[in-house]
């Protein structure tokens, strides 16, 4: 069975995987500290594979990413690159974007424990994650224009939604390095912590709170609703009502109410695997929900 697979014993490329532990928390560590955790194509490919496996694994309830050593990730390893350029504009696919979409499409909550400087895809890969916690000493840069290219990893979608269009344009246009607590990054991080060594412990604390106290299916559907970006309150009302209809009939709803009234920790049982064929939400021509995932 998939949930018996040992992530930690598999030979990943410059990645260390811990867990999932008894609470369902898995940690993916970028383990290339001698190169400031710069990403290579094999690392990226392995992360996409890991996310796909953990998405389908009921024993995984939350995924935390962090970096080995003082850096989180210095971006793509420019000495190796991210593979060949597509033969045409229409066939080329950004490798960083494939990772971003794998994170976005993973139905488990993801947390970035940004323990140090994050540059380029090192920061854009975190934008689709549910939560970002950064060390106060971390430095952040979106340096694409300084390399003669443009934003990657679907960051032109995520960054403006996180920090606002004005700040996003400033960050993209300058490509400069900013401290994690810069006003330009306001909205990007849920928390900034000090010292840097406390970044992962704090992320694990948040992950444990989610894994122990929140319904997996409820967490996913709520995030799905947020990303639908309804154009009006009425549209949001219809989407929420459709999702609530399915959840009112779930074991998790019954347990959530019962545990609250009994003043105890909930024991949620619904899993993504069991719910994979329900909960479809429609919006115009777009059908979204547990069963819908765009191909990478």
Swiss-Prot record:
It is found in: Peroxisome. SUPFAM superfamilies: ClpP/crotonase. The keyword Lyase applies. Keywords: Lyase, Peroxisome, Virulence. Disruption phenotype: Abolishes the production of AF-toxins and their precuror 9,10-epoxy-8-hydroxy-9-methyl-decatrienoic acid; and impairs the pathogenicity. It catalyses: a (3S)-3-hydroxyacyl-CoA = a (2E)-enoyl-CoA + H2O; a 4-saturated-(3S)-3-hydroxyacyl-CoA = a (3E)-enoyl-CoA + H2O. The keyword rRNA-binding does not apply. InterPro entries: ClpP/crotonase-like_dom_sf, ECH/Chromodomain_protein, Enoyl-CoA_hydra/iso. GO terms for molecular function: enoyl-CoA hydratase activity. Its main location: other. GO terms for cellular component: peroxisome. Pfam families: ECH_1. Pathway: Mycotoxin biosynthesis. It comes from the Eukaryota. A motif (Peroxisomal targeting signal type 1) lies at residues 294-296. Its EC number is 4.2.1.17. Belongs to the enoyl-CoA hydratase/isomerase family. Gene clusters encoding host-selective toxins (HSTs) are localized on conditionally dispensable chromosomes (CDCs), also called supernumerary chromosomes, where they are present in multiple copies. The CDCs are not essential for saprophytic growth but controls host-selective pathogenicity. PANTHER family: ENOYL-COA HYDRATASE_ISOMERASE FAMILY PROTEIN (AFU_ORTHOLOGUE AFUA_1G01890), PTHR43684. Enoyl-CoA hydratase; part of the gene clusters that mediate the biosynthesis of the host-selective toxins (HSTs) AK-toxins responsible for Japanese pear black spot disease by the Japanese pear pathotype. AK-toxins are esters of 9,10-epoxy 8-hydroxy 9-methyldecatrienoic acid (EDA). On cellular level, AK-toxins affect plasma membrane of susceptible cells and cause a sudden increase in loss of K(+) after a few minutes of toxin treatment. This is Enoyl-CoA hydratase AKT3-1. The gene is AKT3-1.
């Amino acid at each position: 069975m998939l949930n018996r697979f040992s992530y930690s014993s598999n030979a990943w490329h410059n990645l260390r995987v811990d867990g999932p532990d008894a609470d369902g928390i898995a940690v993916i560590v970028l383990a290339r500290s001698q190169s400031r955790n710069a990403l290579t194509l094999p690392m990226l490919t392995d992360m996409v594979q890991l996310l796909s496996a953990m998405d389908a694994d009921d024993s995984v309830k939350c995924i935390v990413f962090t970096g080995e050593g003082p850096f989180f990730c210095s971006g793509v390893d420019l000495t190796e690159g991210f593979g060949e350029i597509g033969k045409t504009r229409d066939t080329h696919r950004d490798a960083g974007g494939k990772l971003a979409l794998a994170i976005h499409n993973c139905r488990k909550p993801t947390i970035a424990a940004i323990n140090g400087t994050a540059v380029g895809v090192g920061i854009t890969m975190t934008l689709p994650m549910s939560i970002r916690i950064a060390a106060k000493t971390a430095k952040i840069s979106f340096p694409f224009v300084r390399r003669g290219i443009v934003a990657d990893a679907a960051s032109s979608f995520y960054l403006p939604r996180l920090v606002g269009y004005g700040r996003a344009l400033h960050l993209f246009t300058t490509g400069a390095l900013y401290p994690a607590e810069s006003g330009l990054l306001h909205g990007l991080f849920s928390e900034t912590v000090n010292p840097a060594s406390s970044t992962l412990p704090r992320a694990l604390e948040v992950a444990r709170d989610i894994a122990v106290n929140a319904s997996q299916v409820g967490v996913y559907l709520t995030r799905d609703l947020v990303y639908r970006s309804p154009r009006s309150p009425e549209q949001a009302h219809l989407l929420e009502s459709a999702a609530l209809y399915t959840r009112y009939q779930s074991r998790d709803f019954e347990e959530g109410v019962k545990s609250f009234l009994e003043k105890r920790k909930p024991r949620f049982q619904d899993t993504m695997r069991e719910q994979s064929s329900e909960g479809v939400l429609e919006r115009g021509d777009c059908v979204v929900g547990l069963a819908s995932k765009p191909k990478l």
